Amino acid sequence: MKMRTIAKTSLALGLLTTGAITVTTQSVKAEKIQSTKVDKVPTLKAERLAMINITAGANSATTQAANTRQERTPKLEKAPNTNEEKTSASKIEKISQPKQEEQKTLNISATPAPKQEQSQTTTESTTPKTKVTTPPSTNTPQPMQSTKSDTPQSPTIKQAQTDMTPKYEDLRAYYTKPSFEFEKQFGFMLKPWTTVRFMNVIPNRFIYKIALVGKDEKKYKDGPYDNIDVFIVLEDNKYQLKKYSVGGITKTNSKKVNHKVELSITKKDNQGMISRDVSEYMITKEEISLKELDFKLRKQLIEKHNLYGNMGSGTIVIKMKNGGKYTFELHKKLQEHRMADVIDGTNIDNIEVNIK
């Protein structure tokens, strides 16, 4: 019995010792775990502080890089971009610096340094504009000098223009108008609604009205009239008609006519120099109106002999074989009543022109 009790007590003591050992080991383990947890906390805090310091250093490095970039960038950049970069840099610096230093940096960024850059950019931007505008200013006087040098070279042209403008401008304008010739036409009259009667001709489906003045007023009655030729020069709007002519009505040829006459032109200029020209003038009509002769001769004189340039007076004399003559005065337009006069074209002997 004693042995059993001794054995039981020894077993109980062994169990107690093992439990104590396990308790101690568990407590030791718990202390180790707590110590590791405690150790880990400061290490995490240290790592976070290191990261914050790294970010602060990186931010300061970026601000320094931004400042160096701003100093290296050309002065032609706009001031608002620099302000934006500085404000962004100041925002980054807020993480690492205290509030007082942030206010200092903001005040520094608000200082008139960008204004100096703006003034420099404006001065530099205006300088190339002045360089661009200077070449036209240097070139502008050159054409003025050329015009001054050109004007004394043409006094005769100016004299001709001043002479032509008051005296011969209207005559030159009239005798350079286009003329129209129509053969074998049919003429008819309408009821007169003006003081002058008109013969109507329709060549090429267009109506031309011809005023019957002078001898034509009695020669042509109610009509109609067939086989007539007309020489048309459109006149000004005298009778409230857009397109009309005066005179120039003749009979159509009964045979072909090629009658050459001598045309002699004598011209005396303002300096007293006299020039003479002799040529042939072709007559192709049995009956020809004074309107057609006068207009065609003056137009030829304008084109070949500068009539109504600086000279515009003189006469054109149509001499007939029977001793008669018809005179056109160059300083005035042929009268309307004479535009209706008709002569025998084959009876013309010669034509004399005197221009002065």
Curated annotation (Swiss-Prot):
Bias kind Polar residues: ranges: 142-164
Protein name: Staphylococcal superantigen-like 3
Coiled coil start-end: none
Result for mutant: residue 338 to A: About 75% loss of human TLR2 binding
Record text about domains: The C-terminal domain contains a V-shape binding site for sialyl Lewis X.
PROSITE patterns named in the record: STAPH_STREP_TOXIN_2
Compositionally biased intervals (Basic and acidic residues): 69-104
Sialyl Lewis X-binding, as annotated region: 228-326
Native source organism of the sequence: Staphylococcus aureus (strain NCTC 8325 / PS 47)
NCBIfam families: PRK13335.1 (NF009873)
Alphabetically ordered keywords of this record: Secreted, Signal, Virulence
Keyword check for Transmembrane: no
Reported function: Secreted protein that plays an essential role in immune innate response inhibition by interacting with and inhibiting host TLR2. In turn, bacteria recognition by immune cells is impaired and cytokine production is inhibited. Mechanistically, by interacting with TLR2, blocks ligand binding and thus inhibits activation. Second, by interacting with an already formed TLR2-lipopeptide complex, prevents TLR heterodimerization and downstream signaling. The interaction with host TLR2 does not involve sialyl Lewis X interactions.
